[in-house]
Amino acid sequence: MSEDTVPEAASPPPSQGQHYFDRFSEDDPEYLRLRNRAADLRQDFNLMEQKKRVTMILQSPSFREELEGLIQEQMKKGNNSSNIWALRQIADFMASTSHAVFPASSMNFSMMTPINDLHTADSLNLAKGERLMRCKISSVYRLLDLYGWAQLSDTYVTLRVSKEQDHFLISPKGVSCSEVTASSLIKVNILGEVVEKGSSCFPVDTTGFSLHSAIYAARPDVRCAIHLHTPATAAVSAMKCGLLPVSHNALLVGDMAYYDFNGEMEQEADRINLQKCLGPTCKILVLRNHGMVALGDTVEEAFYKVFHLQAACEVQVSALSSAGGTENLILLEQEKHRPHEVGSVQWAGSTFGPMQKSRLGEHEFEALMRMLDNLGYRTGYTYRHPFVQEKTKHKSEVEIPATVTAFVFEEDGVPVPALRQHAQKQQKEKTRWLNTPNTYLRVNVADEVQRNMGSPRPKTTWMKADEVEKSSSGMPIRIENPNQFVPLYTDPQEVLDMRNKIREQNRQDIKSAGPQSQLLASVIAEKSRSPSTESQLMSKGDADTKDESEETVPNPFSQLTDQELEEYKKEVERKKLEQEQEGEKDIATEKPGSPVKSTPASPVQSPSKAGTKSPAVSPSKTSEDTKKTEVSEANTEPEPVKPEGLVVNGKEEEPSVEEALSKGLGQMTTNADTDGDSYKDKTESVTSGPLSPEGSPSKSPSKKKKKFRTPSFLKKSKKKEKVES
């Protein structure tokens, strides 16, 4: 109970002699107000009091705890709980007998079993779309019962649920058409074995299902089959002429196939004959002296065929009984009398084409579903076309004024959030988009702006299938079954083994050219390449050879013989020994002897004696001989060995003034030659003797001097000196 309600104080019981009106005083204002109140207001207040009591019960914690206990019990024990079963019975009884929700049936049915008896817990194990399929099949059974086309046996309506697994829905044996519900249908495989048992305890009629299984095996495109053997259809199936184009309904039926049915389809030969008779496109199968079977891609199409087939058979039977024979009947020609095209429902006086495309028989089937819903059958059918057209509001933003409230009444329920309303609206739009009969294709169209600039770029758009320009002519093949191109009557296990083998090869990354063609096995194709491919391959080959030539250096001795290599090695060793001997001689000559002071008054030797060796040689002569030897070695060797020496004042020690005066003019040329050669070589170290007149400190001995070429006039003077000697 609510906490706001406070129990009133108990009034004392009235005395035995006190009447009802004696309890109130006539002067009481509350009594006067209730007495003067109108009867309508009094009734409204009484209803409000009753609603208030219901609201208090729904908001009470005890009621909430009881509901939670029922939900927990359902989750633990399942749908077989006694409390849940009682609630279902009460809900079904109230829904079927309530005249305010559903109008009364024209046949005055006081109680009828609803078609959609699937609850939320039951639909959890169903496949995608199976709930709606069950409701459609059960509705077809009820329509057969209402039209009087139902028979006691072999009147079965089957539907293919899954093409991949080949599961089908069929009613159990022993259940009449008026008793079939969505939950009572049984799901079986192609062999008639039960996959999922319904709510009833009746078995499956495998003999009656054998005909349907043979049809589904021969026609993978068929999804629904309705077996009908009413008196009219059985009479036409027994005629040699078959169904004649006597009425317009016979033209709407389409092509028909005739088959001699013996009552069962257990033999393999019977299945092959049925496949040959049925063909790839026929939708009506006439069973001789038995009845007819209507096929369709959808439940709506199959019932559309059955409805017009029954009407055509009734017209033909009545016409033959009245005319007395086929020769007295006027037959219609298919070319002259064309039936209406599929989905061409148009407005009156309109020439702009179809109003809205739809599947065959969809509008008629939805009308019958609305009839069943109005009768209280609760079909559970999802309508694609609304019965009442939505009124367009051009000025909806100004027709309804804006209202703002700052408080919420306690009696009002919890307001629905705007986000939830927006989500529900989006879901409705999505459902309408998914249920559209139009077929759209994804097409790449060149952009006009980019096309004008000279670089066309494709633009992806969605277009209707009818508007897309077809590049190739021919009849398109509708592929609905993944095994559509598998040969008939093949071993399914063999197909599965081959599929598993291919998947195993893909897992192991084993790539091959695939199975070899038996027709092209003996054909030898010449390898031909285009000029562009040849040029690309040649340029690639040149680049590879160029890289290889840059990476590897050619061997200069690859063209020589062994004898030439031996001679070359000996020559290299000989030159190496000569260089070592010359180097030893240079070192011996460059080594300074004992320090001897040069006397300024020493006799001047002639140039002829300058090259001879003597035990006591002046430092000047020794330096001259050393310089001459170095000059001769510099002319033969590219990089002469330079001994370390001491450089005084940044240049060689020049001869003294006394020597220059005594030698004369001829001697001066020789000294100039020696002085020029001294700039190319390093001088010997001088430990004693007179320093240069400048007296500047000596530079670092490790510093190298720049070499100069010997002038040509000095070379001539050397030749003259040799001649004189």
UniProtKB/Swiss-Prot annotation:
Each subunit is comprised of three regions: a NH2-terminal protease-resistant globular head region, a short connecting subdomain, and a protease-sensitive tail region. The modification Phosphothreonine is found at T55, T533, T612, T674. Gene3D superfamilies: Class II aldolase/adducin N-terminal domain. GO terms for cellular component: cytoplasmic vesicle; F-actin capping protein complex; membrane; plasma membrane raft; postsynaptic density. Found in a complex with ADD2, DMTN and SLC2A1. Interacts with SLC2A1. Heterodimer of an alpha and a beta subunit. Residues 701-725 have a biased composition (Basic residues). The keyword Transferase does not apply. This is Beta-adducin. Membrane-cytoskeleton-associated protein that promotes the assembly of the spectrin-actin network. Binds to the erythrocyte membrane receptor SLC2A1/GLUT1 and may therefore provide a link between the spectrin cytoskeleton to the plasma membrane. Binds to calmodulin. Calmodulin binds preferentially to the beta subunit. It comes from Mus musculus (Mouse). Belongs to the aldolase class II family. Adducin subfamily. One of its GO terms (molecular function) is protein kinase binding. It is found in: Cytoplasm, Cytoskeleton; Cell membrane. Residues 687-700 have a biased composition (Low complexity). SMART domains: Aldolase_II. Signal peptide: none annotated. Residues 1-22, 525-725 are annotated as: Disordered. It comes from the Eukaryota. It holds the Pfam family Aldolase_II. Residues 425-444, 703-720 are annotated as: Interaction with calmodulin. Its main location: cytoplasm. Residues 596-621 have a biased composition (Polar residues). GO terms for biological process: actin filament bundle assembly; barbed-end actin filament capping; hemopoiesis; leukocyte tethering or rolling; protein-containing complex assembly; synapse assembly. It is a peripheral membrane protein. Residues 566-589, 622-631 have a biased composition (Basic and acidic residues).
